[in-house]
Amino acid sequence: MTNGTIHNKDGFLNRIAERLGRNRRSAGVTVPDYIHQPQHRVYQGYTQDELVGVLKDHCRKIHTELIETDVIGLHDALYEQAARFGGGPVMIPKDDRFKEYGLSGLLTDKWPNEGTKVWEWDAAAGDENIQRAEQANIGVTFSEITLAESGTVVLFSSKDKGRSVSLLPTTYIAIVPKSTIVPRMTQASAIIKQKIADGDVIPSCINYVTGPSNSADIEMDLVVGVHGPVKAAYIVVEDR
């Protein structure tokens, strides 16, 4: 990852230390080694199948459909779920995994021949991508990391994978490779931290999406779809 340029770092940190009423500590500072770390014990030792069970249970609580399939069945599973959501237009990011998981025929042949519009995110198109996402009925993306505990999919945004794909369409479908499922936020943070340590290019935006958009006021009246899709579904697929 390219290193950025930091300006006025010392002056900024010295000012904070001064306001705290102490001298700035610039040496001998280490990350605390906490004795109690219960976050690592949640679902510790669970198999991928057991984590799928945890994910499935929580999806019921967040009003999200969960479908399980393999690579061969993914084409039909996505087609059928899209039909249950009312069909297209469909918005997708530019992602080679659609081809790798055997979905090219659906996206470039079957749906277009049926009159269903399929729009792929195009970095060169600028704001036109956002307009298409607003018009789309379904947004489809792959989950990078999936949190079983909360039913959350983690999305890495980039120039080819705009956040609007999963935010602006009326409904949303996440394709969840089974290997991406981890117990909770603890493991997701560790994965991202390791990517940084390895020098990988880090996404411009990392989003944690938990089912459809849900909002509630002080009277506990649930309102769905205010800040995102009205409905959501996860398709858990065995890895290739």
From Swiss-Prot:
Q: Which Gene3D superfamilies match?
A: NagB/RpiA/CoA transferase-like (3.40.50.10420)
Q: Name one GO biological process term.
A: lactate metabolic process
Superkingdom of the source? Answer: Bacteria
SUPFAM superfamilies reported for this sequence: NagB/RpiA/CoA transferase-like (SSF100950)
InterPro entries reported for this sequence: FTHF_cligase-like_sf, LUD_dom, LutC, NagB/RpiA_transferase-like
By its UniProt entry, which PANTHER family does this protein fall under?
LACTATE UTILIZATION PROTEIN C
What family does this chain come from, according to its entry?
Belongs to the LutC/YkgG family.
Describe the task this protein carries out. Is involved in L-lactate degradation and allows cells to grow with lactate as the sole carbon source.
What is the name of this protein? Answer: Lactate utilization protein C
